[in-house]
Amino acid sequence: MQLHDLNNITDLVPVTESNQVTESNDITYGNGLAWDTPVHKEPVYFQDGSQNPMVYGIRLGDENKLLAGNVSASYELIHNRELVDVCVGEILGPSDIQFSHHYRFFNNKGIFRDIYYADNTIEGYVPVVGDTIRLVAEIINSYNGSTRAGIRFYFQRLECLNGMTSNKYGFECTFTHNKEGSFNWQDQIIRATSILRGSAQSKLNAFVQNCGKLQKPVDNTDIALIRERYLNRLPMQQFGQLMHKYYADKDYTAWGLLNAGTNVLWHPDPKNPKRLTNANFSNNTIVVDGLLQYATDTYDGDTVDPRQTDMFQS
């Protein structure tokens, strides 16, 4: 179990019944299987019929079971339904923040993402432009060991509903699926209740203040530097999409560059606007953390409002 970027862990607050989380009817599945379909960890056998002691198969469903992946013997199977029940009932519900369900994804490899948007109980405003930023909660899991399990929090620009994932400014309570003695993930993960109450506003404040440092013009030389040093891990296709959106939006600032990137990565398919892949999330983090690092490295105290400066008018 790891608590990332969280140093102010306080005593847990007793959990009470809450209806602070609402679920929409607009839920997306990846393959037709229900996200809480039965899942089993089953032995794998050699051709001679003997059991492989090192490998187990994770299979979905009760009949005609679908193989999600092979895992080690020490793999701890965590059911999506149980994880959601704990995260919603013990963390989001008692947090005094109203969360509404946005998106749920589950594919045939057992990758699970469940996303909730927070209300205005906690929000921040980007300096100069005043854009409103709020929290996003994401419950994550996998049945093939490819991702950690738990809950993480990052940000959303309200104006365009772009999600902004960040390893540096976000916070999370996640763990691997490997058994560790008497480790009880249910007991550990509810520590995120006090994390959410104690650290959310300060994390959000730090994020929006650094977004404020992006309110400055960037030219082709700056973009070349950004591409070479800060977005060098972003695939070429996604960088091309980012630049196309950047020029279309005509917000020729570093903030405009970030918003163009998060827009094409959070809304990659106009026909299916909630269709997101693991690559969308990881590339989103590359854009957000890369450009915020650029902002920190190059900040000189000068900012501009692209909506009030002649050089940015169409």
Please give the residue ranges for each predicted region.
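Intrinsically disordered, low-complexity regions enriched in serine/threonine
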Residues: 1-41, 103, 120-314
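N-terminal low-complexity, intrinsically disordered segments
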Residues: 1-107
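Residues at beta-strand starts and edge strands
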Residues: 81, 109-111, 133
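Beta-rich nucleic-acid/ligand-interaction surfaces
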Residues: 98-122
